[in-house]
Amino acid sequence: MRLIRTLTAGLACAALLPAMAAAQAAPQKLRSFTDSWYWGAKGGVSMFGDVAENINAPTVGGEWMITRTRVAMYVSVEQSFFDTQGAVYDPSSSGSARIVDIKDSRRYNVQLFAFPKQYGSFRPYAGLGFALISIRDAQPEGTFVSPASQDTVLSMVNDASSRTTPVFTLGSQYDFSRSAVFVQASAMPTKNRFLINGKPTTYMIEAGLRYNLTDAIEKMH
Protein backbone atom coordinates (compact mmCIF):
# COMPACT_ATOMS: atom_id res chain seq x y z
CA MET A 1 0.00 0.00 0.00
CA ARG A 2 2.80 2.38 0.87
CA LEU A 3 4.38 1.69 -2.54
CA ILE A 4 1.07 2.40 -4.29
CA ARG A 5 0.67 5.69 -2.38
CA THR A 6 4.23 6.68 -3.26
CA LEU A 7 3.73 5.90 -6.94
CA THR A 8 0.42 7.80 -6.95
CA ALA A 9 2.03 10.87 -5.38
CA GLY A 10 4.90 10.70 -7.88
CA LEU A 11 2.54 10.49 -10.82
CA ALA A 12 0.54 13.46 -9.48
CA CYS A 13 3.70 15.55 -9.16
CA ALA A 14 4.78 14.58 -12.66
CA ALA A 15 1.39 15.63 -13.99
CA LEU A 16 1.72 19.02 -12.29
CA LEU A 17 5.20 19.76 -13.65
CA PRO A 18 4.06 21.04 -17.09
CA ALA A 19 1.55 23.40 -15.45
CA MET A 20 4.19 24.68 -13.02
CA ALA A 21 6.66 25.23 -15.87
CA ALA A 22 4.04 27.13 -17.86
CA ALA A 23 3.18 29.28 -14.84
CA GLN A 24 6.84 30.17 -14.39
CA ALA A 25 7.34 30.91 -18.08
CA ALA A 26 4.27 33.15 -18.38
CA PRO A 27 5.59 36.04 -16.23
CA GLN A 28 8.81 36.00 -18.20
CA LYS A 29 6.83 36.39 -21.40
CA LEU A 30 4.79 39.21 -19.89
CA ARG A 31 7.98 41.06 -18.99
CA SER A 32 9.63 40.59 -22.38
CA PHE A 33 10.96 43.78 -23.97
CA THR A 34 11.85 42.34 -27.36
CA ASP A 35 9.21 42.37 -30.13
CA SER A 36 6.68 44.22 -27.99
CA TRP A 37 4.20 47.01 -28.58
CA TYR A 38 4.17 49.64 -25.83
CA TRP A 39 1.45 52.26 -25.35
CA GLY A 40 2.32 55.22 -23.13
CA ALA A 41 1.14 58.46 -21.55
CA LYS A 42 3.41 61.28 -20.45
CA GLY A 43 3.66 64.83 -19.21
CA GLY A 44 6.38 67.43 -18.96
CA VAL A 45 7.47 70.86 -20.05
CA SER A 46 8.39 72.42 -23.40
CA MET A 47 11.03 75.16 -23.22
CA PHE A 48 11.49 77.77 -25.95
CA GLY A 49 11.82 81.51 -26.49
CA ASP A 50 9.53 84.09 -28.10
CA VAL A 51 10.31 87.67 -29.13
CA ALA A 52 10.49 88.90 -25.53
CA GLU A 53 10.87 86.07 -23.00
CA ASN A 54 11.58 82.43 -22.29
CA ILE A 55 8.54 80.13 -22.12
CA ASN A 56 8.10 76.95 -20.05
CA ALA A 57 4.88 75.41 -21.37
CA PRO A 58 3.15 72.44 -19.68
CA THR A 59 2.94 69.50 -22.08
CA VAL A 60 0.98 66.24 -22.21
CA GLY A 61 1.11 63.47 -24.79
CA GLY A 62 0.64 59.89 -25.89
CA GLU A 63 3.11 57.52 -27.52
CA TRP A 64 3.53 54.16 -29.21
CA MET A 65 6.75 52.15 -29.32
CA ILE A 66 7.44 48.91 -31.20
CA THR A 67 10.59 47.19 -29.97
CA ARG A 68 13.10 44.69 -31.24
CA THR A 69 16.10 43.53 -29.20
CA ARG A 70 18.09 46.79 -29.14
CA VAL A 71 16.10 49.19 -31.33
CA ALA A 72 12.56 50.54 -31.40
CA MET A 73 10.29 52.53 -33.67
CA TYR A 74 8.80 55.43 -31.70
CA VAL A 75 5.76 57.57 -32.57
CA SER A 76 4.27 60.24 -30.30
CA VAL A 77 1.93 63.23 -30.19
CA GLU A 78 2.37 66.06 -27.68
CA GLN A 79 0.25 69.12 -26.87
CA SER A 80 1.85 72.20 -25.25
CA PHE A 81 -0.25 74.91 -23.58
CA PHE A 82 0.82 78.56 -23.65
CA ASP A 83 -0.05 82.11 -24.74
CA THR A 84 2.76 84.19 -26.19
CA GLN A 85 3.76 86.32 -29.17
CA GLY A 86 5.86 85.95 -32.29
CA ALA A 87 6.50 88.20 -35.27
CA VAL A 88 6.65 88.13 -39.06
CA TYR A 89 8.16 90.60 -41.50
CA ASP A 90 5.77 93.40 -42.54
CA PRO A 91 7.21 96.60 -44.06
CA SER A 92 3.95 98.45 -43.35
CA SER A 93 4.29 97.93 -39.56
CA SER A 94 6.45 99.82 -37.11
CA GLY A 95 9.94 98.35 -37.17
CA SER A 96 8.93 96.20 -40.17
CA ALA A 97 7.65 93.51 -37.79
CA ARG A 98 4.03 92.42 -37.36
CA ILE A 99 3.31 91.02 -33.88
CA VAL A 100 1.43 87.71 -33.91
CA ASP A 101 -0.50 86.32 -30.93
CA ILE A 102 0.28 82.60 -30.53
CA LYS A 103 -1.67 80.01 -28.56
CA ASP A 104 -0.65 76.37 -27.94
CA SER A 105 1.22 73.97 -30.20
CA ARG A 106 1.18 70.30 -31.14
CA ARG A 107 4.12 68.06 -32.04
CA TYR A 108 3.98 64.90 -34.16
CA ASN A 109 7.15 62.92 -33.59
CA VAL A 110 8.69 59.87 -35.31
CA GLN A 111 12.05 58.50 -34.18
CA LEU A 112 14.25 55.43 -34.15
CA PHE A 113 15.40 54.58 -30.61
CA ALA A 114 18.55 52.62 -29.79
CA PHE A 115 18.81 50.67 -26.50
CA PRO A 116 22.53 49.79 -26.45
CA LYS A 117 22.73 48.08 -23.05
CA GLN A 118 20.55 46.99 -20.14
CA TYR A 119 21.56 47.59 -16.50
CA GLY A 120 19.25 45.40 -14.46
CA SER A 121 15.80 46.88 -14.97
CA PHE A 122 17.18 50.14 -16.42
CA ARG A 123 17.37 50.67 -20.18
CA PRO A 124 19.08 53.91 -21.30
CA TYR A 125 18.33 54.93 -24.88
CA ALA A 126 18.98 57.55 -27.55
CA GLY A 127 16.74 58.51 -30.44
CA LEU A 128 16.94 60.39 -33.72
CA GLY A 129 14.14 61.33 -36.11
CA PHE A 130 11.87 64.11 -37.29
CA ALA A 131 9.06 66.12 -35.73
CA LEU A 132 6.30 68.30 -37.16
CA ILE A 133 5.46 71.20 -34.83
CA SER A 134 2.21 73.05 -35.52
CA ILE A 135 0.89 76.14 -33.72
CA ARG A 136 -2.80 75.74 -32.92
CA ASP A 137 -3.79 79.42 -33.23
CA ALA A 138 -1.84 82.40 -34.61
CA GLN A 139 -3.47 85.82 -35.13
CA PRO A 140 -1.63 88.95 -36.37
CA GLU A 141 -2.27 92.12 -34.37
CA GLY A 142 -3.27 95.58 -35.60
CA THR A 143 -4.76 96.96 -38.80
CA PHE A 144 -3.51 96.73 -42.37
CA VAL A 145 -2.91 99.39 -44.98
CA SER A 146 -4.63 97.33 -47.69
CA PRO A 147 -6.30 93.97 -48.31
CA ALA A 148 -3.22 92.91 -50.27
CA SER A 149 -0.99 93.67 -47.27
CA GLN A 150 -3.31 91.67 -45.02
CA ASP A 151 -3.28 88.70 -47.37
CA THR A 152 0.52 88.78 -47.52
CA VAL A 153 0.86 88.83 -43.73
CA LEU A 154 -1.73 86.08 -43.25
CA SER A 155 0.11 83.93 -45.78
CA MET A 156 3.41 84.45 -43.95
CA VAL A 157 1.78 83.64 -40.60
CA ASN A 158 0.30 80.47 -42.05
CA ASP A 159 3.65 79.39 -43.51
CA ALA A 160 5.47 80.07 -40.22
CA SER A 161 2.88 78.29 -38.05
CA SER A 162 4.31 74.83 -38.70
CA ARG A 163 7.82 73.47 -38.99
CA THR A 164 9.39 70.10 -39.73
CA THR A 165 12.63 69.69 -37.84
CA PRO A 166 15.15 67.01 -36.79
CA VAL A 167 14.74 65.84 -33.19
CA PHE A 168 17.25 64.15 -30.88
CA THR A 169 16.27 62.34 -27.66
CA LEU A 170 18.10 60.93 -24.64
CA GLY A 171 16.26 58.95 -21.97
CA SER A 172 16.00 55.92 -19.73
CA GLN A 173 13.22 53.56 -18.74
CA TYR A 174 12.80 51.26 -15.74
CA ASP A 175 10.98 47.99 -16.45
CA PHE A 176 8.66 46.27 -14.00
CA SER A 177 6.30 43.47 -15.01
CA ARG A 178 4.53 44.63 -18.21
CA SER A 179 5.06 48.34 -17.49
CA ALA A 180 7.93 50.81 -17.58
CA VAL A 181 8.40 54.28 -16.15
CA PHE A 182 10.61 56.61 -18.16
CA VAL A 183 12.15 60.06 -18.32
CA GLN A 184 13.52 61.64 -21.48
CA ALA A 185 14.69 64.96 -22.94
CA SER A 186 14.57 66.02 -26.59
CA ALA A 187 16.02 68.92 -28.57
CA MET A 188 14.82 70.43 -31.87
CA PRO A 189 16.23 73.35 -33.90
CA THR A 190 13.36 75.84 -34.44
CA LYS A 191 15.06 79.17 -35.15
CA ASN A 192 14.32 79.57 -38.86
CA ARG A 193 10.96 79.86 -40.67
CA PHE A 194 8.92 79.43 -37.49
CA LEU A 195 6.92 81.79 -35.26
CA ILE A 196 8.55 80.37 -32.12
CA ASN A 197 12.03 81.63 -32.91
CA GLY A 198 13.33 83.48 -29.87
CA LYS A 199 15.90 80.72 -29.26
CA PRO A 200 17.73 78.50 -31.75
CA THR A 201 16.52 75.29 -30.06
CA THR A 202 13.30 74.07 -28.45
CA TYR A 203 13.71 71.57 -25.60
CA MET A 204 11.19 69.14 -24.13
CA ILE A 205 11.55 67.23 -20.84
CA GLU A 206 9.03 64.46 -20.18
CA ALA A 207 8.24 61.60 -17.81
CA GLY A 208 5.57 58.96 -18.07
CA LEU A 209 4.42 55.35 -18.06
CA ARG A 210 4.62 52.75 -20.85
CA TYR A 211 2.56 49.57 -20.89
CA ASN A 212 3.54 46.46 -22.85
CA LEU A 213 0.15 45.87 -24.46
CA THR A 214 0.90 42.98 -26.81
CA ASP A 215 3.49 41.23 -28.96
CA ALA A 216 4.54 43.26 -31.99
CA ILE A 217 5.34 40.05 -33.90
CA GLU A 218 3.23 36.92 -33.67
CA LYS A 219 5.23 34.21 -31.95
CA MET A 220 5.44 30.66 -33.33
CA HIS A 221 4.40 28.05 -30.74
Regions found by a protein language model. Give the residues of each.
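Outer-membrane beta-barrel translocator domains and adjoining extracellular loop/strand segments
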Residues: 51-58, 85-92, 136-146, 183, ...
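Extracellular loop and loop/strand-boundary signature of outer-membrane beta-barrel proteins
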Residues: 46-50, 93-101, 152-158, 191-197
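Residues that define the transmembrane beta-barrel architecture of outer-membrane proteins
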Residues: 35-37, 54-60, 69, 102-108, ...
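Predominantly the C-terminal beta-signal and adjacent terminal strand-loop region
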Residues: 82-86, 168, 173-221
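Short glycine/proline- and aromatic-enriched beta-strand/turn motifs that initiate or cap beta-hairpins
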Residues: 22-73, 210, 214-216, 221
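Transmembrane beta-strands of outer-membrane beta-barrel pores
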Residues: 43-49, 68-70, 77-83, 130-136, ...
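Gram-negative (and chloroplast) outer-membrane scaffold detector with strong preference
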Residues: 63-146
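Membrane-embedded beta-strand positions of outer-membrane beta-barrel proteins
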Residues: 39-43, 73-77, 110-112, 124-128, ...
